[in-house]
Amino acid sequence: MSKNVPNIRILMAVGLFGVMLGTVGLPIYLHAPKYFSDTYGVSLASLGAIMFALRVVDFVQDPLLGRLSTIGFLPRRLLSAGAGAIIIIGALGLFIVTAPINPTIWFALSLILLFTGYSLSVILLYTHAVNNFADKAQTIVARWREAGQL
């Protein structure tokens, strides 16, 4: 495939993808800790420590997800759909399903799913951009994704 600059239709799709990813962030960082604190009595300090620890896990897993996205044993569309499904399952676990186990552990498990799905989605987006668009288009794609997240 030739490396070119994406057309406006593709950029709008990237922006819409950014909107979807942006809607995940606010509930995770603002609403989830308060919800778990109010509903289950888990201290905000504990929830903050869990969130920090999971960001460290995310730091380690992101290169592995990047490798997964380039191996090619699964079609990227399937990986992308899987990432979206993981985000949905994590969000349902966080806000809809009553914690069937210790709420602190349930919070951590739900966030692991959300962070993994989010990271894989972003990695797949940028992998697609690198593989399909010219170098000068990378910042354009990033700009549209970030604008969508705002």
Roles of regions detected by a PLM:
Residues 1-150:
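Membrane-embedded alpha-helical bundles of multi-pass transporters/translocases
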